[in-house]
Design a protein with these regions (language model features):
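Nucleotide-sugar donor-binding loop of glycosyltransferases
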Residues: 34, 93, 188-190
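His/Asp/Glu-enriched, well-ordered alpha-helical/loop segment
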Residues: 58-65, 107-191, 206-210
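Generic secondary-structure signature for well-ordered alpha-helical cores
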Residues: 21-28, 61, 137-144, 166-170, ...
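Active-site microenvironment of metallo-dependent hydrolases
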Residues: 158-252
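Short glycine-rich, flexible loops that bind phosphorylated cofactors or substrates
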Residues: 76, 97-98, 126, 194
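Short, charged, surface-exposed secondary-structure boundary motifs
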Residues: 99-103, 127-129, 197
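Histidine/acidic residue-rich metal-binding segments in metalloenzymes
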Residues: 1-88, 100-116
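Short, acidic/turn-prone active-site loops that include or flank metal/cofactor-
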Residues: 36, 93-97, 122-124
């Protein structure tokens, strides 16, 4: 359970402050979108006389129980603030590219100790919603923005697993270890996409064409088996989904 106004710029200052109080009364986390693009920076400076990160601090929206999506335009002061307070960031590289928001300074964030996880930002700005595809994109985008040494395959995968767990303030997920929640996925390395990459399966998984998972287990429950969803009647769901999508775009 998370208290999550969409953006601090779409609701009142009082609502943001009261949301922070409410979340901490119930011991749940806070989430919103912040510093996504240059327009956010300009609006925040004009409206509040401060950067989005400074505004978040003023509202009580920093701390280990808070994570912000994007933070593409987070400046040095904002990075240091988030590192000092343990405020997390959900990096959404595909969304940032689709909306031309820019390249989030993930390398600098991590070097300063900011908790960084990985997100897809929902279907409105990411039609694929592939987490392994997002891992690949995070790595490539950091490299194109900050150089070939900006991120390794292992680090990109770490952001998506251990990084996400830290951002969510969870110590029971993100790794395979005794006492942890039984969350894991399995990929078929016999797939043609990974041909020639078996000497380094981790790099192959991140760099090669993203494939669907062979098996997915969430909290001990098998959700995907042999590449197929095991929890729903997928053909029926897809048929209904396509009907509703057609009605929506046609105005029927």
């Amino acid at each position: 359970i998370v208290v999550a106004p969409c953006s601090p710029f779409s609701v009142s200052r009082d609502l943001m402050r009261e949301a922070a109080v409410l979340a901490r009364q119930y011991g749940v986390s806070l989430h919103t979108h912040l510093a996504e693009n240059v327009n956010d920076i300009a609006y925040s400076r004009e409206k509040f006389g401060m950067t989005p990160a400074e505004y978040a601090e003023d509202l009580g929206w920093v701390g280990h129980d808070v994570w912000h999506a994007h933070c593409v335009q987070l400046d040095q002061h904002g990075i240091e603030l988030f590192a000092r307070t343990g405020t997390g960031v959900a990096h959404c590289p595909c969304s940032n590219m689709r909306l031309a928001s820019g390249i989030a300074p993930v390398r600098k964030m991590r070097d300063h100790g900011v908790p960084v996880g990985l997100g897809v930002d929902g279907s409105a700005s990411n039609d694929g919603a592939s987490m392994i595809g997002e891992v690949r994109q995070a790595l490539l985008l950091q490299r194109v923005g900050f150089g070939p040494d900006a991120m390794t395959a292992r680090e990109a995968l770490e952001i998506a697993t251990l990084g996400g767990a830290k951002v969510l303030n969870r110590n029971d997920i993100g790794a395979l270890a005794p006492g942890m929640v039984a969350d894991f996925v399995a990929f078929d390395l016999g797939h043609v996409a990974y041909a020639g990459g078996h000497h380094d399966p981790l790099a192959a998984l991140v760099f090669c064409t993203p494939t669907q998972v062979h098996t997915s287990v969430i909290n001990g429950r098998v959700v995907v088996k042999d590449g197929q969803l095991a929890t729903v009647d997928l053909p029926r769901v897809l048929e209904r989904h396509n009907q509703l999508a057609h009605q929506l775009v046609s105005g029927a």
